[in-house]
Curated annotation (Swiss-Prot):
NCBIfam families: MalateDH_bact, PRK06223.1. NAD(+) binds at residues 10-15, 34, 96, 119-121. Coiled coil: none annotated. SUPFAM superfamilies: LDH C-terminal domain-like (SSF56327), NAD(P)-binding Rossmann-fold domains (SSF51735). One of its GO terms (molecular function) is L-lactate dehydrogenase activity. It comes from Brucella suis (strain ATCC 23445 / NCTC 10510). This is Malate dehydrogenase. The lineage of its organism: Bacteria, Pseudomonadati, Pseudomonadota, Alphaproteobacteria, Hyphomicrobiales. The keyword NAD applies.
Length: 320
C-alpha cells in the first residue's frame, strides 16, 4: 500500500516542524515546497538524516515548483510573512493574500483532491480566500486555529490547577485573533466544568478571567518573547493533529476554522467552531448553545472576521 503524500507549502519554522512531526508519526511521505531555493531541500535532507535515529520510514523531498505537490492527500499551508513584534495578524493581510492566490492556483492545478489545512495569518480571512482561489469544496479546506487556541487554554488551566493537560478539555470559538471566545462553561477538568471549579474554590473568577485573556494574547506573548518570529512548535503540532484525524479517519472532535452555512447564524464565512474531522474532511459542524454574553462575544468575533474578508475583496475583487 502506497504511503500518504503530505505537501507542506512554506518551509519556514512551522513548515520544518510539520515535516519532522509527520515523519515521527509516520503519516506519510513529505514534500516541502518553498520559493526559496535550497531551503526545502536542506530541511528535507536534514529531517531524512534523523530518520535512522528516530526509526521512521518516510521520504522527504524539497521543491521549488508546485508540480512536486501533485496528487497530495493533505496540503498544509504556512507560506506567507510571519508576525513580528508590534504587528497584528491583520497587518499581514495584503502581503499574505497575494501568497494565498498563488498557493490556491498551485493546489487547484496539482492537488485538487487534497484535504487542505491553512495556518497562514490572518487565519480566518486567509483560509476563506484560499478556498475561493483553489476552488476546492469547503469541507476539504479548514483553518488551523481552534486546536492551537484550545491547547493554549488547556495548558494554562493545567498550570493553574496543577493537573495533567490530558485531563483538561477546552473549547475556543470564533476568529483566531484578539476577539476569540474561550468558553469557560464548556471547558472542564476531569469532566468538571470550570464554573463549578470556581465554586469549589479551586480557583477564582479573577484568575480564570486572566487565563482567558492570556489565551487571547497567546500568540502575541510568544512574538514578544522571540522578537524575531512567531510560534511554530504548537501551531505545527495542532495542524498535524487535524491532518492525522483526516488521514486515519479518526473522527476527532476538533475546533477548526470551517465554512459555516447557517450554523451560529453565519453563512459563507470561515469561523472557528467544533467539528468532526474524518476521511471526508469536515464531516459535521457541532452547533453548541451559547448564552447571551457568549453569543455577543461570538458575534463580535464574526464581525471582526467579516471586516477582514471585506478588506480582502477590496484588494482582490475576484473573491466577491
Amino acid at each position: 500500500m502506497a504511503r500518504n503524500k503530505i505537501a507542506l507549502i512554506g518551509s519556514g519554522m512551522i513548515g520544518g516542524t510539520l515535516a519532522h512531526l509527520a515523519g515521527l508519526k509516520e503519516l506519510g511521505d513529505v514534500v516541502l515546497f518553498d520559493i526559496a531555493e535550497g531551503t526545502p531541500q536542506g530541511k528535507g535532507l536534514d529531517i531524512a538524516e534523523s530518520s535512522p535515529v528516530d526509526g521512521f520510514d518516510a521520504k522527504f523531498t524539497g521543491a521549488n515548483d508546485y508540480v512536486a505537490i501533485e496528487g497530495a492527500d493533505v496540503v498544509i499551508v504556512t507560506a506567507g510573512v510571519p508576525r513580528k513584534p508590534g504587528m497584528s495578524r491583520d497587518d499581514l493581510l495584503g502581503i499574505n493574500l497575494k501568497v494565498m492566490e498563488q498557493v490556491g492556483a498551485g493546489i487547484k492545478k496539482y492537488a485538487p483532491e487534497a484535504f487542505v489545512i491553512c495556518i497562514t495569518n490572518p487565519l480566518d480571512a486567509m483560509v476563506w480566500a484560499l478556498q475561493k482561489f483553489s476552488g476546492l469544496p469547503a469541507h476539504k479546506v479548514v483553518g488551523m486555529a481552534g486546536v492551537l487556541d484550545s491547547a493554549r487554554f488547556r495548558y494554562f488551566l493545567s498550570e493553574e490547577f496543577n493537573v495533567s493537560v490530558e485531563d483538561v478539555t477546552a473549547f475556543v470559538l470564533g476568529g483566531h485573533g484578539d476577539s476569540m471566545v474561550p468558553l469557560a462553561r464548556y471547558s472542564t477538568v476531569a469532566g468538571i466544568p470550570l464554573p463549578d471549579l470556581v465554586k469549589m474554590g479551586w480557583t477564582s473568577q479573577d484568575k480564570l478571567d486572566k487565563i482567558i485573556q492570556r489565551t487571547r494574547d497567546g500568540g502575541a506573548e510568544i512574538v514578544g518573547l522571540l522578537k524575531t518570529g512567531s510560534a511554530f512548535y504548537a501551531p505545527a503540532a495542532s495542524a498535524i493533529q487535524v491532518a492525522e484525524s483526516y488521514l486515519k479517519d479518526k473522527k476527532r472532535v476538533l475546533p477548526v476554522a470551517a465554512q459555516l452555512s447557517g450554523q451560529y447564524g453565519v453563512k459563507d464565512m470561515y469561523v472557528g467552531v467544533p467539528t468532526v474531522i474524518g476521511a471526508n474532511g469536515v464531516e459535521r459542524i457541532i452547533e453548541i448553545d451559547l448564552d447571551k454574553d457568549e453569543k455577543a462575544q461570538f458575534d463580535k468575533s464574526v464581525a471582526s472576521v467579516a471586516g477582514l474578508c471585506e478588506a480582502c475583496i477590496g484588494i482582490a475583487p475576484s473573491l466577491k
